[in-house]
């Protein structure tokens, strides 16, 4: 059973839950990430937050969403994933992967200043 949580518009019409699932500390195993994301879905959370600095989180999220699509018939399109680059982030990663995999990118103020001053 899905608990209907409130959703709000975010960006260009995406509807996201009021609560976001942060994945910084959920990188122990695929099984743990899968269960956390599955439980989040069933309480109405559809917004996942991650960052390259979270270790294996991005990979585990991707594998978990694929597994949820197969085992629970929960489409990957149900999710809004927010990625971010921290002040000491990898700008090459940002440059090479932003267009491929990211819908929403959060940049800390220090990152914006570095980008404005750099030629990437």
Predicted regions and their residues:
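N-terminal binding-site loop/beta-alpha segment at the start of enzyme catalytic domains
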Residues: 1-79
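Active-site beta-loop-alpha junctions enriched in small/polar residues
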Residues: 24, 51-53, 84-88, 115-119
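Structural motif corresponding to the early beta-alpha repeats
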Residues: 72-95, 116
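Glycine/proline-rich, positively charged
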Residues: 90-120
